[in-house]
Amino acid sequence: MNFLRKIVKNCRDEDTQKPSPVSAPLDDDDLWLPPPEYVPLKELTSKKNMRNFCINGGVKVCSPNGYSFRILRHILKSFDEIYSGNHRMIGLVKVVIGLALSGSPVPEGMNWVYKLRRTFIFQWADSRGPLEGEELEYSQEITWDDDTEFVGLQIRVIAKQCHIQGRIWCINMNPRACQLWSDMSLQTQRSEEDKDSSLLLE
């Protein structure tokens, strides 16, 4: 039993592992309406401090007994304190995590895997955000254990600047993504040039 728990705690994928009856979060698990500052975005009228990124991101959720959306929110509320990546791109990482976890998970052994591969347009306020040409390869495991339940998150985000036409990142179509961004304290402000746009402050 201890050996199995060790495997689970490390979120390892073994070929001999059998799928467990874990359950992904229910669609109606503690959802709420998105905060008002997240608005549908149109084409940006200002090109200042704007970057196109080709994103390859994913979040693997490891839990022997299933998990709820509420637990994922609880874990991510401390994201600022435990983030180990490039802090000039923490806002981008939060956006990718929110969008990935608001998608549909794929079962993989004892894990659930959320993936996101898209090209997005990000715009940062003032002089914030990554340097010109700067890229990100971020990988981190975050665990939560209260002796009765264990949940591990393996987060991986690769962001490379590219010139492919992309989508504006903040699309107000999914309240779960907005909930996760609120939990992670994603900092944005309304663009002065385009009132339908939000700028990242981190």
Curated annotation (Swiss-Prot):
UniProt entry tagged with the keyword Phosphoprotein: yes
Localization of this protein: Virion membrane; Host endomembrane system; Host cytoplasm
UniProt KW Membrane keyword: yes
Residues the record marks as site: Involved in the inhibition of stress granules formation and contributes therefore to virulence: 95
Name the UniProt record assigns to this protein: Matrix protein
UniProt miscellaneous comment: Most abundant protein in the virion.
Chain location of the short sequence motif PPXY motif per the record: 35-38
InterPro entries from the UniProt entry: Rhabdo_M (IPR006870), Rhabdovirus_M_sf (IPR038617)
Alphabetical GO biological process terms: viral budding via host ESCRT complex
Cellular component, GO annotation: host cell cytoplasm; host cell endomembrane system; membrane; viral envelope; virion membrane
Annotated GO MF terms: structural constituent of virion
Name of the encoding gene: M
